[in-house]
Amino acid sequence: SSAASDVYKRQKGMGTTVVAATISNQMMYFANVGDSRLYLINQGIQQLTKDHSLVEEMVRLGGIKPEEAKHHPDKNIITRAIGAKADVEVDFYEHRLKRGDIILMCTDGLSNMVEDEELFHIVQGGRDIVESGQALIEAAKENGGTDNIGVVLIEPFADEVSVL
């Protein structure tokens, strides 16, 4: 319709990032666009998604070191977003889960403000998944976070479900 076309023209260049996951039996299937991330936490922390950002490209091409990327002035420039163009390339992944795994999905409002090691210690130190989620948000705020802070924690083999 022409109304939808008008909205798209006015909002041209705007977009959002996304990370999504589904679990079937012991397999997790997940996807991302932009710099929203999925981490796997168990004995350590591992980022399973790749950021679609300018600094991530610079790291992949060897232009800067991963440590430099964390504080690079262009770290918020993303190279893919939903809605920025008529179509977008989505990265899809799969991972076999095991007992003790915890999945953390988050926006850059968390990952830009809290180092991976601190994320790990906060999640492992919580009494339960809800307390851990609240502590992650508080840590981002305490570190100066002003961006949207989106956090999802999943314990795939938990006996009960808790929602924050």
Predicted regions and their residues:
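Short, small-residue-biased leader/transition segments that mark boundaries at the very start
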Residues: S1-Y8
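Catalytic core regions of nucleotide second-messenger enzymes
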Residues: K9-M14
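Conserved subregion of the PPM/PP2C metallophosphatase catalytic domain
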Residues: T16-C106, L110-L164
